[in-house]
Curated annotation (Swiss-Prot):
This is Uracil phosphoribosyltransferase. GO terms for biological process: UMP salvage; uracil salvage. Catalyzes the conversion of uracil and 5-phospho-alpha-D-ribose 1-diphosphate (PRPP) to UMP and diphosphate. Pathway: Pyrimidine metabolism; UMP biosynthesis via salvage pathway; UMP from uracil: step 1/1. Its EC number is 2.4.2.9. It comes from Shewanella denitrificans (strain OS217 / ATCC BAA-1090 / DSM 15013).
Length: 208
């Protein structure tokens, strides 16, 4: 599995700000969008382009345009919604697929409760977004679902990842790509990432 920890100074700075215990909902939400945008820039760097001639202000001009598969953004509810706008800044025409999964706080296992996947997902590149890759259960379950519907081009974008989650994801789906703003130290006994960001969903939605 291709794992990319994006170490750009802007990303490192912004993720650092997100770790503050008393960060406001507004600020956390803004930073999640900004880092999501920067991760999208990196994750799409291998998209193929083709030459197209258009009519410019002074006559015909040859330009580069993205070619190949179109994109579907797949936020994992609910926290993934906090990164979605950052992706759409760069790919505003992307279709949106939604997967609802929550983690059982006792077993740490993923529990699916909703899905709405675009009908032609097998023809698209799926960018799955979720702020935290902890145990990896929710991400694995989402990718299982996408593959069951024929999607073969999948990239996962997360703000913070634990080594345990990366290992689990690689074991389950070695053919996907993972882009993260930070690979953190470990999981604690409750399955939370250390040092992590806290509960990203609560911080994005103001329910902490």
């Amino acid at each position: 599995m291709k794992v990319v920890e994006v170490k750009h100074p802007l990303i490192r700075h912004k993720v650092g700000l997100m770790r503050e215990a008393d960060i406001s909902t507004k600020r956390f939400r803004e930073l999640a969008t900004e880092v999501g945008s920067l991760l999208t820039y990196e994750a799409t760097s291998d998209f193929e382009t083709e030459k197209v001639t258009i009519e410019g202000w002074n006559g015909p001009v040859e330009i580069d345009q993205i070619k190949g598969k179109k994109v579907t953004v797949v936020p994992i509810l609910r926290a993934g919604l906090g990164m979605m706008d950052g992706v759409l800044e760069h790919i505003p025409s992307a279709r949106i697929s939604v997967v609802g999964i929550y983690r059982d706080e006792e077993t740490l296992e993923p529990v699916p409760y909703f899905e709405k996947i675009v009908s032609n997902v097998e023809e698209r590149i799926a960018l799955v977004v979720d702020p935290m890759l902890a145990t990896g259960g929710s991400m694995i379950a989402t990718i299982d679902l996408l593959k069951s519907k024929g999607c073969t081009s999948i990239k996962a974008l997360v703000l913070v990842a634990a080594p345990e989650g990366i290992a689990a994801l690689e074991k389950a789906h070695p053919d996907i790509e993972l882009y993260t703003a930070s690979i953190d130290k470990c999981l604690n006994e409750q399955g939370y990432i250390l040092p992590g960001l806290g509960d990203a969903g609560d911080k994005i939605f103001g329910t902490k």
